Structures are given as structure tokens and as C-alpha cells.
């Protein structure tokens, strides 16, 4: 069978559209759409961010180039102004309040804050320290082994400011730390060491460490100062001691020479010996005895129980009249009240162990000898805790010397 195609219709005579014509139509349709519009809030946000970025960048550039030197100069000017104000106030105070300055414990003529500490260095010593001009080109140097090079110090540790080209820098001799000239000079007037590492400026042998002028308020009651009296006694001794030429003229006779030396020592030595004995008694909390007294007191002082008693006994404070009851815990007192091995003898007022009150039969120990010594029972009623504590009032009281004289008379 054959299929016959139908004849074309009259309306289908137009040609089919080509693909190029379809693409052009799509482009025309897209171009006819309305353009994209940005909202005003979005535009405002973008503008604000851009302005902030420009402002921060500009401020950083200005602060690095211009503001940091201005702030540095302003701080230096303020420090100099403060120093001038202190100096002017010190000069006015020195002229108007001479009585107050004489009462002040500081041996200085001005009230400048740098002179409050007596441990600083003198200006003549400070001026001997090396002085340099700072150079940024020298910052590339490497420090020595175990030391810090001045070239690596880019800022001052006192004022916390960076060094500038041409600044006067003072370098410390031992630690090689560098600081501004004005900063380190002001520091060294009140401190003898480095602000960073605390290294002594002049070494251990050259540090100026005078004695502190501060004196405790309660020192005269507890321990009087005997340094001035000892120095005066030494000066008097130097005045009394004859010169070497006088000794050579007197040395013709040996006996006369010895007599003169003995007389000079008798005139000057009692004061010095008394002061030294008192100072040692304050240190060891006991009084120095002569050789004869030590020999006679040997049986009463060699007992280990006596040392234990003096060690654990409750000390009385020299300010006992101000305190109603002692708050210091005493192991000796607590043990004596709780332990059955200790009994109290009401006549002597001293605690004795049972082994010492009733010595063992058949043998005698040093402890029993010390307890049976007549000197112990003579001195026990007269013993004072103030003497054991090293109270100066008890050491210097006439009652103590009267008791010693009575003890010697009884011997």
C-alpha cells in the first residue's frame, strides 16, 4: 500500500522560525525589564563603612608620624614642670620652716622627694656614668653573652617612652641597660641599683648604703641606743691616749710605761666595756659575769634542766602592766599544769621534776648536784624573768646590784 501525503493547507505557507530569531527575541524581552535599584539603607551602610576605614587609616598614619612625638614632648615638659614646682616648694619650705626641718629625721636641706631615701647615689657618682647619643642604626647589634646591649634597648624603662634619634642616653656599667638622661639621674638619686634588673650600680663593694635615719619609737624603752655613747668613749680614749713620741720618751723605764698604760686603760676602758657587755646581754638575753662569779655559779648553771626551764618558761613582757593576761602560749606552763611528773614547791616558787626532788639511790648525777647546790637556793628566790628577758630597766636597776652585793657578802 502506498501512503499519499495530504496536500498542504493554504494557511501553512509561512516559513518556520529560525533559531537566531528566537535568541534575538529573548534579548529584546530582557532589555525591556526594569533596571536593578539599590535601597537607601544599603547605600548608607556602605558609605559609613568606607568613611570609618578611611578615618582609621588616616588617624593611624597621623599618630605614627606626628602625634607620638608631640605626646612624648608633652610628657617631658610636664615632668620638667613638676620638678621645677618641687624645687620651688622646697626652697620656700627651707626658708620659712627651719624649725620643722630641724625636727625632721632626714639629714638633708631640702624636702625634695628624691632626697627622702638615704640610699641613693651622689651627683658626682652619677655624672661619672657613661653618656651616649642614641642612634637607630646601632639597634641591629647583637648583645654580648650574658649581658644586655644598650643598642637593643629601644625604650626607657622609667618613662616607658621609645628612644628618639639624638636622645641623650645613659648606660649603666654592669648590666648595660640604657635610659634617658633625666629619667635615670632622677632614679639614681634615690636608688643605687638598676630599675630593670636591680643590679648594683657600683658593685657590691661600692654601693652607698648609709645607716637608716629611722628610729623606732619604742626603742628607748626596750633597748636604749648605746652607739653614741660608745663612739664618744672612743673619742675620749683617743684624746686621753698619749702620742707615740710621748710613749717613746716615757719608755725609758719599763715599769713606768706599764703603769701609765694601765692608768690610761682604767680611765677609758670601763665605759667601753660596760657598753659592750650591755649590748651583748641584749643579744644573748643574759648578763655577762666575771670569771670568779662564773666559777662559783658553775654548779647552778650547768644543769640541762635549768636550760630547759629557761627555754620553755613563759617570758614576761616589759609591758606587762598594760596587759592583764598574757596571750602567748607557753609549752612549759601547759606541761606543768597537765603532766603528773611535775609538782610545784610553794617555798621556792619553781617547778621541779619528781626525779630531781627524789634522786635515785646509789648514784649522783649532775642534775642532782645542781639542785642541791647552795648557790641555787640562794639565787632562786632572787631570780627575775625580766633579767632573763634582757630588760634594760632590770639590768640597769640599782636593786640588781644590791642583790649581787648581798650574795657576795653571804659567800
Curated annotation (Swiss-Prot):
PROSITE patterns in alphabetical order: ZF_RING_2
Biological-process GO terms, alphabetical: protein ubiquitination
Compartments reported by the entry: Membrane
Keywords tagged on the record: Membrane, Metal-binding, Transferase, Transmembrane, Transmembrane helix, Ubl conjugation pathway, Zinc, Zinc-finger
Pfam families listed in its UniProt record: zf-RING_2 (PF13639)
Known EC number: 2.3.2.27
CDD domains noted in UniProt: RING-H2_EL5-like
SMART domains: RING
Zinc finger (RING-type) residue numbers: 156-198
Any one GO molecular function term: zinc ion binding
Source superkingdom: Eukaryota
Keyword Transferase found: yes
Annotated stretches, region: Disordered: 1-32
Catalyzed chemical reaction(s): S-ubiquitinyl-[E2 ubiquitin-conjugating enzyme]-L-cysteine + [acceptor protein]-L-lysine = [E2 ubiquitin-conjugating enzyme]-L-cysteine + N(6)-ubiquitinyl-[acceptor protein]-L-lysine
Keyword Metal-binding: yes
Transmembrane segments: 36-56
Topology class, membrane: Single-pass membrane protein
Any one of the GO CC terms: membrane
Pathway involvement of the protein, from the record: Protein modification; protein ubiquitination
Sequence ranges of Low complexity compositional bias: 10-21
Written domain comment of the UniProt record: The RING-type zinc finger domain mediates binding to an E2 ubiquitin-conjugating enzyme.
PANTHER family given in the database record: RING-H2 FINGER PROTEIN ATL16, RING-TYPE E3 UBIQUITIN TRANSFERASE
Homology family: Belongs to the RING-type zinc finger family. ATL subfamily.
The name this protein goes by in its record: RING-H2 finger protein ATL65
Species name: Arabidopsis thaliana (Mouse-ear cress)
